[in-house]
Regions:
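Catalytic core of membrane glycerolipid acyltransferases/transacylases, capturing the structured
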Residues: 1-45, 89, 104-106
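Non-catalytic C-terminal accessory region of glycerolipid acyltransferases
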Residues: 10-11, 33, 52, 56-181
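Short, well-ordered alpha-helical scaffold segments within catalytic/effector domains
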Residues: 24, 48-55
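A conditional alpha-helix N-cap/helix-loop micro-motif detector
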Residues: 44-48, 75
């Protein structure tokens, strides 16, 4: 449902970073169905090249779809990369989320992904554009990261409540780091 939204409703050109591996290529194929241009890349393998490709897309008028908690979590904890992209390009960040019912919540995955079931009804939410100043120091980046994380998580809670789903809470950062280490 979410991939359908930008092209059909907002009439925007969209791109998203997808893994060059087999699972990512399945996602890339699906994104093309929704008129979202996939960029093959990884935040692990050659992240600088991936960042350059994403910057080029932004400069050429594409909006960038980023999962703000990254490919490995922790769940619902914003990474810094959206803030860096916005700061470098002057493009705003718009937090977008959805919830639907009926759905399946992937309870065994770290991110508790919500998967809409056929004929589900959905709720979408978009924040107002959030502009990030150029040249932020580390404290400024962290301030914006926390602000965006709060906005995105409140939106997700509102969408879940409107759809009649249980609220999925952000992961405890301390517990997540303990499991990784």
């Amino acid at each position: 449902m979410m991939p359908f939204f930008p092209h059909r409703v907002l009439k925007r050109k969209m791109t998203a970073l997808v893994s060059p591996h087999q699972d990512g290529q399945i996602i890339a194929h699906l994104l093309k169905w929704f008129h979202i241009t996939p960029i093959n890349g990884s935040s692990n393998e050659n992240p600088r090249q991936s960042a350059l490709e994403l910057m080029r897309a932004l400069i050429h008028g594409y909006d960038l779809c980023i999962s703000p908690d990254g490919p490995r979590g922790p769940r619902m904890r914003m990474k810094k990369s959206p803030i860096y992209f916005a700061s470098k390009t002057g493009k705003p960040i718009v937090c977008a989320c959805y919830s639907s019912k009926p759905c399946k919540i992937a309870s065994t995955s770290w991110d508790r992904t919500l998967i809409p079931l056929p004929f589900a009804k959905g709720v979408f939410a978009l924040s107002n554009p959030i502009y990030v100043p150029e040249g932020l120091d580390d404290d400024g980046v962290e301030t914006y990261r926390q602000k965006l994380e709060r906005i995105a998580n409140l939106q997700a809670q509102e969408c879940d409540a409107l759809a009649g789903n249980p609220v999925i809470e952000p992961a405890d950062v301390y517990d997540f780091k303990k499991k990784e280490g």
